[in-house]
Amino acid sequence: MIAGIKQSKKALEASKVKLAYVANDADENVIKPFLHLCKKKAVEVNRELDMKELAKLCKIEVPTAVAVVTISNVVEI
């Protein structure tokens, strides 16, 4: 899992993202280009968590607006 908009965007541009998390309390001006790129790359976006919950999911202390699950993190069953 990658946290942070810059690193998440790089992974998305490289087509390595399976699922994107965008915090529901993130600044829309900040995440709008990222959401557009998710749509362009046909990546599902989950907006159920806020920035603090997303940080907890990523096991980091600083709230984050964006995180992604990369293809290498996904195990098919």
Where are these regions (language model features)?
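Feature captures the catalytic cores and cofactor-binding loops of soluble hydro-lyases/lyases
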Residues: 26-52
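Alpha-helical transmembrane segments of helical membrane proteins, especially in multi-pass transport
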Residues: 21-22
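Ribosome large-subunit tunnel/peptidyl-transferase-proximal elements
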Residues: 1-17, 27-29
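Short basic, glycine-rich beta-strand/loop surfaces that mediate nucleic-acid
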Residues: 43-77
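Signal for well-folded cores of large energy- and translation-related assemblies
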Residues: 13-16, 39, 59
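Aromatic-enriched hydrophobic runs in primary sequence
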Residues: 3, 31-36, 60, 72-74
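Short, flexible, solvent-exposed loop/turn segments with mixed acidic/basic and small polar residues
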Residues: 9-11, 33-34, 56-58
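General secondary-structure edge motif
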Residues: 17-18, 34
